[in-house]
């Protein structure tokens, strides 16, 4: 498990791995659904350096009444 940079939960799981061994991995937090790549800068991957303005409290995800829809794909 990996620590989520956005909500600090310890529930980050590997979603995908690079076809080139060790180049990168993609993680997803099972608490807040944030995704990040291992190759991104520490300001994204390191919970201590993640911008506090974008941090969320995991308890708030339980009461979130509206989740933004994924926009339609443009042709």
Swiss-Prot record:
The UniProt record lists the keyword Ribonucleoprotein: no
Alphabetical UniProt keywords: Aromatic hydrocarbons catabolism, Detoxification
Expression induction or repression: Up-regulated by salicylate via the transcriptional regulator BsdA.
GO biological process, one term: catabolic process
Phenotype of null mutants: A triple bsdB-bsdC-bsdD deletion mutant no longer converts vanillin to guaiacol, the conversion stops at vanillic acid.
Keyword Nucleotidyltransferase belongs to the record: no
Protein purpose: Involved in the non-oxidative decarboxylation and detoxification of phenolic derivatives under both aerobic and anaerobic conditions, however the precise biochemical function of BsdD in metabolism of phenolic acid is unknown.
Note: It is not known, if phenolic acid decarboxylase forms a complex composed of BsdB, BsdC and BsdD. The term subunit is often used in reference to the operon, however there is no experimental evidence to prove the existence of the complex.
Protein name listed in UniProt: Protein BsdD
Organism in which the protein naturally occurs: Bacillus subtilis (strain 168)
Gene label: bsdD
């Amino acid at each position: 498990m990996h620590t989520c940079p956005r909500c600090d939960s310890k529930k980050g799981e590997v979603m995908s791995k690079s076809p080139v061994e060790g180049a990168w991995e993609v993680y997803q937090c099972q608490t807040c659904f944030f995704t990040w790549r291992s190759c991104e800068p520490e300001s994204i991957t390191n919970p201590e350096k993640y911008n506090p303005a974008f941090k969320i409290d995991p308890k708030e995800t339980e009461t979130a009444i509206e989740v933004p829809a994924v926009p339609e794909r443009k042709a």
